[in-house]
C-alpha cells in the first residue's frame, strides 16, 4: 500500500465533510411543490414542514414525538427518488438527528418492509454504489449507526464489512478515509470489533498505519486510522493480539515525532488500552516510552485527557519496572537513555552475575551504549556512563574486546579530549582498564 503519491481526484475527505454538510443543508427542498404534484401526501408535507429548517431542539422534540412517521418518510423518500440533491439532503438529516439524539438510530433500525428482509439496510446499500462521494460517505455513516442499533442479518453485516475492506485496500486516500469513518461507527459495538478482527481487519489497519508512518504524513488519515485502532483495542483479546506486531513501537514513535496534539492524544489513549495486555508493557519500556512519558508529563496540554492518560501509563509501567530483575531495570535505563549513576553500574556483583545477559538480542544493550557515544546530542553524564559500562563489559566478558570490535568500533580516543572533565576521566579510566585487561591476558599466556 503506497501513500506517497495518492490519487485524491475522487472521494471526500473528512476535513471537507463539515463544509459540504453545511452547503447541503442550505438547500431549499420544494416540499410544497411535491405536495402539489401529489409526490407526497398532505400529512407528509405537514410532517416535514414542521421539521425542516428548525432548530436542533425542535427537531429532537418533533422526531421523538413521531419517530416512526419521520423514519418512514426519510427512508421511503430516499428509496423512491433519483434526485441526488434530495438524497444527499435526506441522508444529512438522518445523520443529523442521530447525532442530536443517538436513540434515533434505534428508530431507523425498526422500520420493515414485507417484501424486503434487508430493509432498511438495503436502501443504504444501494446508495453505496452511487458515483457520488458525499452520498457514499453519509450513507455509510447512517448505515453503520443503524446497524449498531439494530439486528442486521449476517449477510448484511458481511456485505457492509466487505465494502469497507475494499475501500481500506485502495491507494486513494479519500476512499480509504471514507472506509475508516464508516468503520469507526461499527467499532462502537464489540460484536463488530470481533467480526472485523476475524476477517483480518486489525492487521489491515496496522498495515495502513505503518504505511502512513513511512510517508509524508497525511494528518487526517493518520488520525482516522489511529481512531479505528483505538476503538478496536477496547476489546481485550484484540488488544492482547496486537502485542508483538509493532503497533506499540509505531504509536510510541508517533508520540515522539508528530507535534499535532490530537495525534498525541489518540496515540496515548490507544497505548493506555494496550497497557497490561500481552507483552505491550515490555514493548513500551523497550522502546524508551518511560523517558518520553516523563518529558510529556511536564508539558502543558490543552486537552485534559492527555495528562490523565500519561499518569495512568507512568503508574502502570512503574509497576513493571519495580518487578523487573536488576538486569532488566538496567537494560530499560540504557534503552530509554535515562542514564543515572545507579548502584548497578559500579557493582562488581552485578557485572559478574549478569555478564552473559549482555549477549541477548544480538548484544542489544552494547549497541545502545555504542550509540550513546556516537550521538552528538548525548549529555556528559550519558557519555560518562556509556564509557564506564562498555569498559566493564570488556573487563568481565571473556570475549569482551572481540565482541566490541564486531558490534562497533570503540571511540574512547575521540572523547578523552572533551572539555567535560567527567567524560575525560571516564574515557581515560576505560582505556586504562582495557589496557590492564590486555596485559593480564598476555601474562596469562
UniProtKB/Swiss-Prot annotation:
It comes from the Eukaryota. GO terms for molecular function: proton-transporting ATPase activity, rotational mechanism. Pfam families: V-ATPase_H_C (PF11698), V-ATPase_H_N (PF03224). One of its GO terms (cellular component) is vacuolar proton-transporting V-type ATPase, V1 domain. Keywords: Hydrogen ion transport, Ion transport, Transport. Belongs to the V-ATPase H subunit family. V-ATPase is a heteromultimeric enzyme composed of a peripheral catalytic V1 complex (components A to H) attached to an integral membrane V0 proton pore complex (components: a, c, c', c'' and d). Subunit of the peripheral V1 complex of vacuolar ATPase. Subunit H activates the ATPase activity of the enzyme and couples ATPase activity to proton flow. Vacuolar ATPase is responsible for acidifying a variety of intracellular compartments in eukaryotic cells, thus providing most of the energy required for transport processes in the vacuolar system. This is V-type proton ATPase subunit H.
Amino acid at each position: 500500500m503506497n501513500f506517497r503519491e495518492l490519487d485524491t481526484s475522487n472521494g471526500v475527505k473528512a476535513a471537507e465533510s463539515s463544509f459540504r454538510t453545511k452547503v447541503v443543508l442550505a438547500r431549499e427542498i420544494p416540499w410544497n411543490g411535491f405536495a402539489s404534484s401529489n409526490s407526497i401526501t398532505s400529512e407528509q408535507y405537514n410532517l416535514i414542514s414542521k421539521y425542516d429548517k428548525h432548530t436542533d431542539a425542535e427537531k429532537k422534540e418533533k422526531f421523538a414525538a413521531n419517530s416512526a412517521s419521520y423514519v418512514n418518510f426519510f427512508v421511503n423518500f430516499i428509496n423512491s427518488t433519483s434526485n441526488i440533491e434530495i438524497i444527499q439532503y435526506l441522508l444529512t438529516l438522518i445523520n443529523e438527528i442521530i447525532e442530536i439524539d443517538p436513540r434515533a438510530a434505534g428508530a431507523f433500525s425498526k422500520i420493515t418492509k414485507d417484501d424486503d428482509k434487508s430493509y432498511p439496510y438495503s436502501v443504504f446499500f444501494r446508495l453505496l454504489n452511487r458515483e457520488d462521494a458525499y452520498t457514499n460517505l453519509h450513507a455509510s455513516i447512517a448505515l453503520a449507526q443503524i446497524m449498531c442499533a439494530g439486528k442486521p442479518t449476517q449477510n448484511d453485516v458481511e456485505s457492509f464489512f466487505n465494502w469497507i475492506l475494499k475501500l481500506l485496500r485502495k491507494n486513494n486516500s479519500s476512499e480509504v478515509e471514507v472506509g475508516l469513518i464508516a468503520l469507526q461507527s461499527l467499532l462502537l459495538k464489540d460484536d463488530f470489533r470481533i467480526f472485523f478482527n476475524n476477517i483480518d481487519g486489525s492487521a489491515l489497519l496496522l498495515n495502513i498505519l505503518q504505511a502512513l508512518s513511512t510517508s509524508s504524513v497525511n494528518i487526517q488519515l493518520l488520525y482516522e486510522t489511529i481512531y479505528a485502532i483505538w476503538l478496536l483495542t477496547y476489546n481485550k483479546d484484540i488488544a492482547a493480539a496486537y502485542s508483538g506486531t509493532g503497533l506499540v513501537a509505531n504509536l510510541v514513535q508517533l508520540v515522539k515525532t508528530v507535534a499535532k496534539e490530537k495525534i498525541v492524544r489518540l496515540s496515548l489513549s490507544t497505548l493506555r488500552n494496550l497497557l497490561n495486555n500481552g507483552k505491550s508493557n515490555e514493548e513500551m519500556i523497550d522502546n524508551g516510552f518511560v523517558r518520553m512519558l516523563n518529558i510529556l508529563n511536564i508539558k502543558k496540554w490543552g486537552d485534559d485527557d492527555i495528562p490523565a492518560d500519561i499518569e495512568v501509563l507512568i503508574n502502570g509501567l512503574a509497576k513493571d519496572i519495580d518487578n523487573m530483575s536488576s538486569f532488566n531495570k538496567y537494560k530499560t535505563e540504557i534503552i530509554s537513555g535515562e542514564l543515572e549513576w545507579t548502584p548497578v553500574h559500579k557493582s562488581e556483583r552485578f557485572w559478574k552475575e549478569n555478564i552473559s545477559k549482555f549477549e541477548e538480542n544480538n548484544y542489544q544493550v552494547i549497541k545502545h551504549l555504542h550509540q550513546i557515544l556516537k550521538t552528538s546530542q548525548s549529555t556528559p553524564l550519558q557519555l560518562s556512563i556509556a564509557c564506564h559500562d562498555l569498559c566493564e563489559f570488556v573487563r568481565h566478558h571473556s570475549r569482551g574486546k572481540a565482541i566490541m570490535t564486531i558490534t562497533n568500533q570503540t571511540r574512547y580516543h575521540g572523547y578523552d579530549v572533551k572539555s567535560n572533565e567527567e567524560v575525560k576521566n571516564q574515557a581515560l579510566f576505560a582505556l586504562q582498564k582495557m589496557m590492564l585487561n590486555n596485559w593480564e591476558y598476555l601474562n596469562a599466556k
